């Protein structure tokens, strides 16, 4: 992890020194993305594996052509339909998150067309709906779960035009602190996003 953070800092310093190639573009943009993959829901002595699908709506501020900051809203939907050793199944949970991220794009695959990007940040998450059904069909519902995570992305972005960018990423979120009950650990998500710079 220390090596990864040092690498990001090096990329950041290089990115901040880059000259603006598209000075006529606004420093503001938006991003819409969706992802799907495996996740683990833990809490109250449970560890349930399942699938999660996510959507994100982000606002971007381009500090330079290589570095941008992002914040917005993410929605995560978790589902586990198989019987586990603890006799829990039909588990459904919905989490809302507010991320603050910094994204670096430095290593160009094709000049001014495609680049490898790295993103890291912090994210506050809260369960807005949680339902756990047991083997005897009893149910428990909770909406008080709150946890902090570190979202990370690595992927490739391709410029469709001066304004539009299409990205493909491998994403994860490492849980760092849980305040109540349940938390969602993303083991590895495939994410697709479209960015528009004003």
Model-derived features: where do they sit?
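Cleavable N-terminal export/targeting peptides
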Residues: 1-26
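Short glycine/proline- and aromatic-enriched beta-strand/turn motifs that initiate or cap beta-hairpins
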Residues: 18-61, 197
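Short loop/turn motifs that connect adjacent beta-strands in outer-membrane beta-barrel proteins
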Residues: 19-28, 65-66, 107-115, 160-164
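Residues that define the transmembrane beta-barrel architecture of outer-membrane proteins
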Residues: 26-28, 49-53, 92-98, 114, ...
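Transmembrane beta-barrel strands of outer-membrane/channel proteins
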Residues: 30-38, 71-75, 118-126, 156, ...
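Outer-membrane beta-barrel translocator domains and adjoining extracellular loop/strand segments
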Residues: 41-48, 81-87, 128-137, 179-186
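Gram-negative (and chloroplast) outer-membrane scaffold detector with strong preference
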Residues: 60-135, 195-198
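Predominantly the C-terminal beta-signal and adjacent terminal strand-loop region
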Residues: 72, 76-83, 93-95, 141, ...
């Amino acid at each position: 992890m220390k090596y990864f953070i040092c690498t990001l800092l090096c990329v950041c310093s290089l990115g901040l020194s880059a000259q603006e190639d598209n000075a006529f573009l606004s420093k503001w943009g938006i991003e819409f993305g969706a992802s799907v993959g495996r996740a683990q829901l833990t809490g109250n002595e449970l560890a349930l594996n399942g699938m999660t699908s996510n959507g994100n709506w982000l606002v971007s501020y381009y500090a330079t052509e290589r570095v941008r900051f992002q914040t917005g809203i993410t929605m995560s939907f978790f589902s586990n339909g198989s019987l586990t050793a603890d006799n829990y199944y039909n588990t459904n949970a919905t989490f809302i998150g507010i991320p603050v991220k910094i994204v670096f794009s430095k290593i160009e695959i094709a000049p001014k067309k495609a680049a490898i990007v790295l993103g890291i940040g912090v994210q506050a998450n809260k369960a807005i709906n949680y339902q756990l059904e047991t083997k005897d069909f009893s149910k428990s519902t909770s909406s008080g779960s709150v946890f902090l995570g570190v979202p990370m992305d690595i992927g490739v972005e391709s410029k469709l035009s001066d304004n539009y960018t299409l990205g493909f990423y491998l994403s994860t979120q490492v849980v760092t602190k849980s305040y109540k009950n349940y938390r969602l650990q993303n083991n590895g998500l495939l994410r697709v996003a479209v960015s528009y710079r004003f």
